[in-house]
Amino acid sequence: MKELIMLIRPEKLEDIKKILDEINCGGMTLSTVMGCGTQKGVSTEDAAVVNELKGFKTTINLLPKVKVEVVVEDKDVEPIISKVRDECATDHVGDGKIFIKDVEDAIRIRTGERGIKAL
């Protein structure tokens, strides 16, 4: 099993939910987060707008993101990544990131089921 941690633009959330529904993903955890990448959260065209909204200059501007966390079977990882990239890539800075982690086990608290059955 793998955990996919996807940091995406908020407006792409419905697309991600649709992708996960198509593969019958058992569930997901969503969080509203703020962050920045190597561009420190601002592209050249965004800098004036962000600074105007903040009312002061900052050295690092954090942008709103949605963090989507899912645990899936290994076989589903590459199809999900491919579909997420197809739907979420805008060719602009700030499209997000996907992190992949190994999951040793999963346990459904209510029933005690383990592994894939717990998803």
Regions found by a protein language model. Name each.
Residues M1-L119:
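Positively charged, small/polar-rich N-terminal and surface patches that mediate targeting and assembly
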